[in-house]
Design a protein with these regions (language model features):
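Electrostatic cytochrome c docking/interface patches
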Residues: 28, 590-614
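Repeat-blade elements of multi-bladed beta-propeller folds
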Residues: 40-44, 77-99, 125-152, 176-197, ...
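C-terminal capping alpha-helices of c-type cytochrome domains
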Residues: 146, 157, 607, 646, ...
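Sequence/structural segment immediately N-terminal to covalent heme-attachment motifs in c-type
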Residues: 603-625, 649-654
Length: 691
């Protein structure tokens, strides 16, 4: 009798659980397996980062039957930009402030939730960071997250309990993490952000995936020569810098775009822009400034330098190369090349031989006026005179948003096409009001060495497209106009489909070969995350996080025109299946700010200008350029708190809303508070009664 009870209990546990425990061991072999499509094991699905799934149950013929299988409300979340993982029927994702959840991928039931308490750990760094994360990693039964405050945390995938934790940054510095960690060969690697808020010297670090112990670190730019260089690569790089660059950090932070290449046992690191942006300040005598805006290949076991390719020598526009690096076998000149594909901010699409870093081709995928072309013999861009704002200012395409930002592109080996969300908008690069010799690096506020974040961006200033690109011919095959300007990454499948969410809240499927629009649904909020697909018991699912977020929201009216007002529209995780019957849950219609003018408030123009300076350094990253919120935080022009000096001080200086993610600015004196209030009232009045 006891044996029978034990047998029935064991059977119940196996059947009742949403997955068979331990069925898939996620390691190098499974992460490199392109044929297995039931799981989504890594940020880009596999090591190749193609975001291509071999699943084809949902295809060009059946996609019109797609419907909602389940959805999960996420009322405590704000920005949802991440890629979920799916392992044996369990979906894992990170939400706001790095809160991580495991969900039954069949039903949407939450199995566990892990809160790393990022707000508490962040301290003053909360002033300079966003709440969102692009994803997480999975390795041998552990979910590994990178918290926004700079920690790596390994979580038991079954229980949701912490296994180990390690701090990857100096918490006294203005560093944070929004990128997804990557795992390979028993290690987990992560970089960080903070180039605009600190005298930042970028680096990537690999840790033991079982213990969290540091394995190796690679610095992206050289430090002070007087301290000696860490390796020969840094000594080589230092020859490309001038002046006392180390006092400004140099930059190069790798906040996204790290790919493991198993065929060459190397890690490919896409590096960031300069700290500060303006090369006239950080390297006044010129120079290429290695390894800014580069792809750097490192030995996966030791972290030693192997080769590099620099996309923007002497970077001065925030044209970083932190975008995803996709691996593929491509035919060039009758030969099959182990290639990488990369579309950084600068507007060119690169195909590079990943065995040695040799440039194979590079062509423009959007409007570019800083360079005419890339010379294939030298591998260098041919710059257009004046683009470095040598005379103090210049209108240049693209803007710091780039032609392509971090939103993931996908590659379909069946069509041979890459699907890229692109942006077309310029920026006025200007440093006429800056003393280039006395400029000092920021510390917990924004400082780029150019005038930035001081104005609203009009609704018609930027456009966006979904571009299908042939990487061999280096030409457009098809494209679709998208709502401006912040649209998420793509997914492509063996069903001859491309899926993409949109800034206006639509989720759309296209024919991957022809670009024909086949299916769409409106989900009630702006979409900033890419979809994933997986299969359970022979049924294909597609899941997507919906929650407007990311740096594009700082663009004021350009982002606000969609009406995704802060705190109004619900955040959700949607999952679609063939013949899904659930109705899309209701969501409020688009809502727009209603600025409040106080007619008897006498605006002091000098105070308001000082307030603009403070706002551009400390507030616009969340509340939007020109005091126009793009939806990430409250629009201060309509906030009742900004009508009361005492209430405003209580929030801004005393930190009364710290628990909700509003940082504390204890350093603000009366002049800063009054300046901000006068600036907000000025911008509100402009909106109500005109300029």
């Amino acid at each position: 009798m006891e044996l029978r009870r034990a047998w029935f209990f064991s059977l119940f546990m196996i059947i009742g659980l949403p997955y068979a425990a331990g069925a898939t061991i996620v390691d190098d072999a499974t992460l490199a397996d392109e044929a297995e499509g039931d799981n989504w094991l890594a940020y880009g699905r596999t090591y190749a980062e193609t975001r291509f799934s071999p699943l084809d149950q949902i295809n060009e013929d059946s996609v019109n039957r797609l419907g909602v299988g389940w959805y999960l409300d996420l009322p405590t979340d704000r920005s949802l930009i991440g890629t979920p993982l799916v392992v044996d029927g369990i979906l894992y994702f990170t939400g706001s402030f790095s809160v991580t959840r495991a969900v039954d991928a069949r039903t949407g039931k939450i199995l566990w939730e892990y809160d790393p308490k990022s707000i508490e750990h962040a301290g003053d760094r909360l002033r300079i960071m966003w709440d969102s994360s692009r994803g997480l990693a999975y390795w041998k039964g552990k979910v590994i997250i990178a918290t926004i405050d700079g920690r790596l945390v390994a979580i038991d995938a079954k229980t949701g309990k912490r296994v180990w934790e390690t701090m990857t940054v100096d918490p006294r510095r203005a560093f944070y993490i929004t990128g997804a960690p990557k795992v390979f060969r028993g290690k987990v690697i992560i970089g960080n952000g903070g180039t605009e808020q600190e005298a930042a010297r970028g680096y990537v670090t690999a840790y033991d995936a079982e213990t969290g112990k540091q394995a190796w670190r690679f610095w992206i730019v050289p430090g002070n020569p007087a301290d000696g260089f860490e390796n020969e690569a840094m000594a080589m790089a230092a020859k490309t810098w001038t002046g006392e660059w180390w006092k400004h950090g140099g930059g190069g932070n790798a906040w996204n775009g790290i790919t493991y290449d198993p065929e060459f046992k190397q890690v490919l690191v896409g590096t960031g822009n300069g700290s500060p942006w303006n090369r006239k300040i950080r390297s006044p005598g010129g120079g290429d400034n290695l390894f800014l805006c580069s792809i750097v290949a490192l030995d996966a076991d030791t972290g030693e330098y192997k080769w590099h390719y620099q996309t923007v020598p002497g970077e001065t526009w925030d044209y970083n190369s932190n975008m995803d690096i996709v691996l593929a076998d491509l035919k060039y000149g009758g030969q099959t090349i182990k290639a990488l594909m990369h579309a950084p901010k600068n507007g060119f699409f690169y195909v590079i031989n990943r065995a040695n870093g040799e440039l194979l081709s590079a062509e423009k995928i959007g409007k570019v006026t800083w360079a005419s072309h890339v010379d294939l013999k030298s591998g260098r861009p041919v710059e257009i005179a004046g683009s470095r704002y040598e005379d103090g200012e210049e209108l240049v395409w693209p803007s710091p948003y780039g032609v392509h930002n971090w939103h993931a592109m996908s590659y379909n080996p069946n069509t041979g096409l890459v699907y890229i969300p692109t942006i077309e908008m310029p920026a006025l690069f200007k440093d006429t009001g800056i003393d280039l010799k006395s400029w000092s690096s920021p510390h917990f506020y924004v400082g780029t060495g150019v005038e930035f974040g001081r104005a609203d961006t009009p609704a018609d200033y930027g456009t966006a497209k979904l571009l299908a690109w042939d990487p061999i011919k280096q030409q457009k095959v098809w494209q679709h106009d998208l709502p401006p300007q912040w649209n998420p990454g793509t997914l492509t499948t063996a069903g001859n489909l491309v899926f993409q969410g949109r800034a206006d809240g639509e989720f759309v499927a296209y024919n991957a070969e022809s670009g024909e629009r086949l299916w769409a649904v409106k989900l009630g909020s702006g979409i900033s995350a890419p979809p994933v697909t997986y299969a359970i018991d022979g049924k294909q699912y597609i899941s997507l996080l919906v929650g407007w977020g990311g740096a594009g929201l700082i663009s004021g009216t350009l982002a606000a025109q969609h009406g995704w007002k802060y705190g109004v529209h619900p955040r959700r995780l949607f999952t679609f299946i063939l013949d899904g019957k659930l109705a899309i849950p209701p969501s409020p219609p688009p809502a727009f700010a209603e600025p409040i003018d106080v007619p008897d408030f006498e605006i002091d123009s000098a105070l308001a200008e000082h307030g603009l300076d403070v706002y551009a350094e400390s507030c616009f990253l969340c509340h939007g350029g020109g005091a126009v919120s793009g939806g990430y935080a409250t629009d201060l022009r309509e906030s009742p708190i900004a009508l009361s000096r005492d209430a405003f001080r209580e929030v801004v200086v005393d930190g009364s809303k710290l628990a909700k993610g509003m940082p504390r600015f204890r350093q603000f004196a009366d002049r800063e508070i009054d300046g901000l209030l006068h600036y907000i009232r000025r911008e509100a009045r402009k909106a109500v009664v005109g300029n």
